[in-house]
Design a protein with these regions (language model features):
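Short alpha-helical segments enriched in small residues
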Residues: 1-174
Length: 174
């Protein structure tokens, strides 16, 4: 399920968080977030909604590689081989978050928000996302242009869009 911002461009983060809450209630889902470059922005958006404690118990901000390993169970070999900004790392992040929290659906985000830190392989604005649970994950790589703040805000939106799209798909809505 590849996500494009185009189809969601007019939906605010607040509206996405509200829709996420409705979708969680409709499906009985609980959600978690394992965040790196967004620094807790997804958890903040979710918990801005009154009653979000019904479906959001915990989130993880694992900015350093050591935190990814300690909090989420990301393997040292994964980080050494693929790096923090990779499909493999976000898969392990979301699996660990769901395993630890018991959530039925999670999102993991790791990227290069800038202004420095980019490379030819992973330029500034490269963000990897994984949605899923401790058994199965879907990953997507997106290039989100802009300043550090713009990249981070766009990543929060994309993370929420992915959660909403997956839950609304489960409940039969498109």
């Amino acid at each position: 399920m590849a996500i494009t911002l185009e189809e969601w461009r007019d939906v605010s983060v607040d509206a996405l968080a509200e829709r996420l809450g409705k979708a969680c209630r409709a499906t009985g889902a609980s959600v978690t977030a394992a965040e790196s470059c967004t620094g807790g922005g997804v958890a903040s958006a979710i918990t801005d909604v009154a009653g979000s404690s019904d479906y959001f118990e915990t989130g993880y901000v694992a900015y350093a590689n050591s935190a990814k390993q300690r909090l989420l169970g990301v393997r040292e070999a994964t980080l050494a081989t693929h790096g923090a900004v990779s499909a493999e790392t976000v898969r392990e992040m979301v699996a660990g978050a769901c395993r630890d929290s018991g959530a039925t659906l999670g999102v993991a985000i790791s990227g290069v928000a800038g202004p420095g830190g980019g490379s030819a392989d992973k330029p500034v604005g490269t963000v990897w996302f994984a949605w899923g649970d401790d058994r199965a994950q879907e990953v997507e790589r997106h290039h989100l242009p802009g300043t550090r703040g713009e990249v981070r805000r766009a990543a929060v939106r994309m993370a929420l869009i992915g959660l909403v799209a997956r839950l609304e798909g489960e409940s039969g809505r498109d």
